[in-house]
Amino acid sequence: MSGLAAKQVFLRNFCKNILTSERLSCYNLVGTMANSAAQQKLNQASMEPFLETYYTSSNNYEIPLNFLPENLTCESNMQTVLGTNACVETPMFLMDKYMSDKQKYKAMRQWIRFKKEKLTSNSEESFILRVLSFNILAQYLLETYPFLYKAHDKQALSWKIRRQLLLQEILGAQANVICLQEMQEEHLEEFLVPLRELGYNYLYKKRTNDKKDGLLFLYRSDQLILIDYAKVELYQSGIELLNRDNVGIIAKLAVKKNPEIQLVIATTHLLYNPRRHDVRLGQTQLLLAEIERIAFLENTMTGAKYLPIILAGDFNLQPHSGVYKFIVEGVFEYQGRGKNLERTDYRFLSNSLIPPRLCITDNCQHFNVLKQRLRGEGTDKVMLENSEHHNVDTSENNSSNVCEVKTDTTDFQTIEIAHDYRVNFCSGTLTHPFHFNSVYKHQNCHGEQEATTNQGKWITVDYIFYSDLELLEVYDLPTATRCNTLPTIPNFAVGSDHLCLAATFKLRKSKL
């Protein structure tokens, strides 16, 4: 077949099923075909995203994404995107890289099902929910710390390339709820375009102060209703332990066809500093207090009852470290430990983690909220600062808790709110009322460690925790050994320096 005939056949068939503005991005590659093997590779490379779209197990994913943006199909435009000093390779060579990397990556990521029932079997009593969590790597952080990406293929670091790869993986998961970390604010609107077309609504919370990225929480508005939410700032002025710009988003959702089926989903991105586990513990205490406030249903004879909860994100901590144990075990004694939350003979933590003036108990509950619930007294005012609202006044003259919570001391104190119900401050031990499990077990059946990112070596720092839900399937994580066979991420298959996490749950109606 002549080159002209090949182009005509390619265009006639290629344009039938393409819905995006970048449908001709592979067109210029056709002219380079010199033999049948090359022609076959082109057909495979150009049509694979579309074949995946139409032969997927669900028809909900309707926007096919092509790999190479249109303006990257010639060397001059590629130099514009990547910089004049970038080493530019031919589109065919890039396509070879893409196919090789993607095939390796796809072989590592499989959906593992635990239940035999159909994943579309929604009923009046239950709903099948899929959640995806992904740290997508803010471009400005990549460019601010280029020394971290010296070993990477520079052409895979372009935002235009990474955005396509990220969206391809995110949309391909067909999740009802998507939790993204490191969503750069200036890239938000363009990133939302295909997601809005598929019916996703969103919440966005930028990190505080001068940070340029934040959290993006998306949910399918044709399936879920947003009932309540909180955008949580983990920065609290005047508190050394809480002077970092991390944030959280908490959403209370109901199933649109049956609003009595509800749950709470939260996402966060905790402090990175590997030495400051104590900071992450304090951030977690604050975040869990807000989750407790939103997820609460009622008090019963056996204690408080809560909605099902999912907590997902980049926690910047490894499995079985102090904060991890606190989340899954519900209790952690920090007094006498070092800032890494390990036992130490020097510079150990005292009995006080965060100051009582925030009115958050050692059981990760807001004191004001508890008083309102148990006594019907006062207001349920939360004593946390938030730059999106008027800052709270924590002075003694204006605090409704001054008579009960001693806010000017770090001494241990216990307060009886109701008969046989006491709360503690500065006890040296944290607890929380939830029963979290991790979706991932962090090692495979052979004892090999799973991984979500590479920080000098492949480790796990990203998690999906859940309570009172039935886990149906999980998007399997590769082991560190298998990850080492991939080109350093981001690459031409993975658009971030983290791997995405996803799981499918059965959500049942809460029984009151």
Feature annotation, model-predicted:
Residues 2-197, 207-214, 285, 340-341, ...:
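N-terminal, active-site-proximal structural segment of metallo-dependent hydrolase catalytic domains
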Residues 40-42, 46-55, 59, 64-67, ...:
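Active site of divalent-metal-dependent phosphoester/diester hydrolases
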Residues 91, 95-128, 177-278, 348-357, ...:
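Structured beta-strand-rich core segments of catalytic domains in phosphoester-bond hydrolases
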Residues 118-120, 254-259, 292-304, 331-341:
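Alpha-helix termini
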Residues 130-137, 161-189, 218, 250-251, ...:
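Active-site beta-strand/loop signature of hydrolases that rely on acidic residues for catalysis
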Residues 143-149, 169-174, 196-199, 261-269, ...:
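Surface-exposed beta-strand-to-loop junctions
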Residues 147-149, 325-328:
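Short secondary-structure boundary/capping segments
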Residues 270-289, 320, 327, 331:
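Active-site-proximal segments of metal-dependent phosphoesterases and phosphodiesterases across multiple
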